[in-house]
Amino acid sequence: MTQTKKIYISDVTLRDGSHAIRHQYSVEQARQIAQALDEARVDSIEVAHGDGLQGSSFNYGFGAHTDLEWIEAVASVVKHAKITTLLLPGIGTVHDLKAAYEAGVRVVRVATHCTEADVSRQHIEYARQLGMEAVGFLMMSHMTSPKALAEQAKLMESYGATCCYVVDSGGALGMNDVRDRFRAFKDILKPETQTGMHAHHNLSLGVANSIVAVEEGCDRVDASLAGMGAGAGNAPLEVFIAAAERLGWNHGTDLYKLMDAADDIVRPLQDRPVRVDRETLALGYAGVYSSFLRHSEAAAAKYGLKAVDILVELGKRRMVGGQEDMIVDVALDLLRQREAASL
């Protein structure tokens, strides 16, 4: 990568970060965080329930506000950054996408499991019809090979996505894993199609993996203030920017404003520290969807189990995003096994 190439900085504090506090951002908190990010000159600010448009539900957890209330609050203060949102086909609809567009969203990341890009077609095509920028977002990218992942990205590109993401939802990718996936993308995607990296910090590799991605030609990097996100969080934005600064990379943001926002605004909101610990490390080790953390901890407390045991079993069963309802089933299975062993 040349030093002159501008890295697109995509903040996810107000979407992925929502997982860390069970989707309970107040409208005022969303407004305050967005204003701080905008003043620090990030390129985009993603806003939604942690599980995307219409994610507020029994399965994922109910948000303190609707997506539109959060989006409108952010739109009222943002002057520079593009307002972005996330949509999972089958949860969010084209009607939700249109409403988000009318509220101020200009970029949508259409997210599917890493082997299911074909379900993104309707939403990517509709976003382009609205005049939005459509981005393909391949979750749990560690669960398929680099070549197969690139083929899925190619599908999204064919539907109209102008950028395709490697999404390490489980925080399970190593640096060579990231390198291999971006090289596979480069081999198959059009030169004009951008690529992005969405890292999680469960193995403490969020920043390192993002750096490797940029070294391999990645155009966009997701990160969040104080790492606010599911599991051990995303790549901490202020840390990535500091590292990029030392490497002489062009990121276009104000490091000190990001540091202040991380410590003064975001970190105090964490009711559970966003960090690598026993449970979040288990996510990366077992390759489990990072947003399963809080659900698994709740199930463990309810049934007198260890959250780590639940998470490792979820990894063995290769559970993916959207199967949150199975966490209780796994807990009950473990409880039955424990009771049988004690007889």
UniProtKB/Swiss-Prot annotation:
Substrate binds at R15, D16, S169, H198, Y289. Keywords: Aromatic hydrocarbons catabolism, Lyase, Manganese, Metal-binding. InterPro entries: 2-IPM_HCS-like (IPR050073), 4OH_2_O-val_aldolase (IPR017629), Aldolase_TIM (IPR013785), DmpG_comm (IPR012425), DRE_TIM_HOA (IPR035685), PYR_CT (IPR000891). Its EC number is 4.1.3.39. The active site is at H19 (proton acceptor). It comes from the Bacteria. Residues 7-259 form the Pyruvate carboxyltransferase domain. Belongs to the 4-hydroxy-2-oxovalerate aldolase family. This is 4-hydroxy-2-oxovalerate aldolase 1.
